[in-house]
Amino acid sequence: PFGRFADIPIYSDAYTAAHLRARMPYCFVDKVYPGVPRIYLQEVEAGQVFHINRTEVLPLRVMHGRLPILGYRIGGRLGYITDMHMMPEESYEQLKGLDVLVMNALRPKPHPTHQSISEALEAAGRIGAKETYFIHMSHHAGLHADIEKQLPPHVHFAYDGLEIDF
């Protein structure tokens, strides 16, 4: 499990890939010693479709504060975005027509690098997925059951172990 017997695939833009190689050089040598994660690093570009097996994946530009990062549209039906504070208009357009959106919603109060719950609700409303699941919440978000009651019927606070069928 967790890459012990197989490479862990990581799909990132060139900037992130360079930082991973610089900060974790021991993962990218020819002979990796026991206990070191085996990483398969694949560089991708925002707006350029790639495939994982036969599934189409579209990387989307989003911002983590001032740091450009990637979110993903997977298989045309799933959007996955974490660590986002805002996204450009083009990325909103690329997320239209989703069945499921998984997106970060850190806490009620604003944060410089993550969406607040109200910002996430606004972004989710603009995207218009059939179902939205908020992830990456802090302990400041409040109790799961209390927050869930305040969300629209198609928006949910995710939880560990959640499985989504769509």
Per-region residue spans from a language model:
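Binuclear metal-dependent hydrolase catalytic cores
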Residues: 1-80, 146-166
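Switch II (G3) loop of P-loop NTPases
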Residues: 80-86
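Cap/insert and terminal regions of metallo-dependent hydrolase folds
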Residues: 86-166
